[in-house]
């Protein structure tokens, strides 16, 4: 069963010269570990689009200096049972005690089982940005 990330990731399209490449080719080059067919499937499934909401097709050309949003997918994701603890929160700062084995941000096979996604869910704040990223094996 394909698992889709709860929140989109961002990719900025740089200033490039004409002729502009297809977005699918740019993404394949930018994210070389992801097969082109996976990008085609994401695009056809509506999981890749411009930040303004405009749909992208496999024939869409890059538009320099624009933002793409895309949803990561994985075939399976292991549930991480350890819980984070919010230790301080105000309008500008959120301090959290992160458990072992929980990645800070979506990466690799962890697209929903990560601290950032959990905190967005818990607080309702989709603008959270980590300022200290410790690795998956580290707690604190």
Mark where each language-model region is:
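RNA pseudouridine synthases
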Residues: 1-140
């Amino acid at each position: 069963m394909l698992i889709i990330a709860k929140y989109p990731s961002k990719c900025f399209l740089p200033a490039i010269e004409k002729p502009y490449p297809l977005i699918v080719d740019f993404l394949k080059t930018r994210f070389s570990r992801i097969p082109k067919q996976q990008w085609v499937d994401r695009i056809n499934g509506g999981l890749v689009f411009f930040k303004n909401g405009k749909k992208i097709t496999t024939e869409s050309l890059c538009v320099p200096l624009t933002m793409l949003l895309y949803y990561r997918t994985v075939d399976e994701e292991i549930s991480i049972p350890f819980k984070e603890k919010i230790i301080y929160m105000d309008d500008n700062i959120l301090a959290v005690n992160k458990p072992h084995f929980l990645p800070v941000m979506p990466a690799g096979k962890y697209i929903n089982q990560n601290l950032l996604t959990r905190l967005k869910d818990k607080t309702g704040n989709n603008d959270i940005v980590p300022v200290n990223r410790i690795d998956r094996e580290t707690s604190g």
